[in-house]
Amino acid sequence: MSGKNLRFYVALYMSKLARTALRVLKRNASYFPGKLAIKICPDFLGRINKPETIITVTGTNGKTTVCNMILDALEANGYDVLNNKAGSNINAGVASSLVAESTMSGKCRKKIAIFEIDERSSKLIYPYIKPTYAVCTNLFRDSIHRNANPEFIFNIINSSLPESSHMILNADDLISCNLGAANDKTYFAIDRLATDKEESVNLINDVRICPKCHKPLHYNYVRYHHIGNAKCEFCGYESPKADYLGKLDMDNQILNVVTPSGTEEYHMVSNSIFNTYNQLTAITVLRKLGLSYEAVKKSFADLNIVE
């Protein structure tokens, strides 16, 4: 959607006025200005100008950490990045971020943005925000009253995603790796670990049958829950091949990443497998954005995450 009508300009001016008032009062202006803009102009997100390059990050776990890693690395390399780090990850928060960095005519001041996106808000955001790169970290069960089953969230995201977006997905997650059948994709994964099991030992595993033919799915190995590597012995469905494959050297705290251009060595920011996935996600995004191996490596050299 394009074009700025009178309703849009009223929404923009009122939201900027609200933002100024909140800041004068030393209040958080990361939610209400956007909420007001969308209340006045329901398709506000579709009409306001956006940066040339947009990265969105959604998923059950790790999206905030991944966003912060990407943002820190980009800023360390001289990028001026629009983001919603300070506030809400729903549509009003994204709108507030765009209002804050727009001129009075609705023109965006920045050329690149990274937005953390709440999974359930995908249907309110993706129809208007067309990300260059759409990242999904993983999909797991969450609080039952909010997100219910991961398939429910999968369907919300999958039905909302623009086909033009290049997806960056976890090949080890047998739910989220199936997002965006028509989209271009880049996959990341972590190679088999000594601690992986031959079969699931968790009480919860939401992928026990093949998502294609619905017959029993064979796991080559299971890391936890439905994270692992699998192949269907009936229809041939299998875990996607990783474009960025992490090989962990836990003794020396090194993350070796096998990429399309060769193997790269990074300092592991954490002993936790969860944060190693987060780091690998960020590395994949940054390399796809065009940052050099040396620049990305330097960004993680002195970073440590407190467990």
Regions found by a protein language model. Name each.
Residues S2-K212:
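Phosphate-binding loop of NTP-binding sites
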Residues L12-A21, Q253-M268:
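Short amphipathic alpha-helical segments and their helix-coil junctions
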Residues T64-A76, K247-T263:
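Acidic-glycine-rich active-site phosphate/pyrophosphate-binding loop
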Residues D80-K85, E265-I273:
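A short glycine/serine-rich beta->alpha loop
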Residues D191-I254, V269:
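Cys/His-rich short segments
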Residues N202-N205, S270-T281, V306-E307:
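Short glycine/threonine-rich catalytic loop with a Thr-x-Gly-x-Asp
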Residues Y237, L248-N252, T259, V285-E307:
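Gly/charged, well-structured mid-domain segments that form the phosphate/adenylate-handling core
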